[in-house]
Amino acid sequence: MQTAMVVTWTRPIVGREDRALEYGAEVNEYWSQHARQGKCSEPAMFFTEAGNGIWMVTGERDVLMSLHDTEEARMLTLKGELLLENFCLEFYFAGDAAADYMLRYQSALAFI
């Protein structure tokens, strides 16, 4: 099932800006390593002019969940929570899985 692992945040916590930049490089290196092995897409990062950010990788859900459930990835998540305001990590349905979700949602509406 195609999935996107998406991280959002508003800005670095004041006083931790330098460490947040180092953290961004660390996260990209971890996930780029897995992308080179064909386990996920290359990381993509987006910023607004106000500094809000979005970071994501895509891949098969079971593979992304397995990679996210490693000690190194769990530590990266904890660091993100300590360095970035409003840090949020979520898994999204993507590609055909998103279309399938919409069909299931439509079917579920019949019960309301």
Q: What positions do the PLM features span?
A:
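Mid-chain, well-packed structural core segment of small domains
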Residues: 57-83
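Short S/T/G/P-rich N-terminal loop/turn motif that feeds into the first structured element of a domain
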Residues: 1-52, 59-69, 91-112
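Short, mixed-charge low-complexity intrinsically disordered segments
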Residues: 86-87
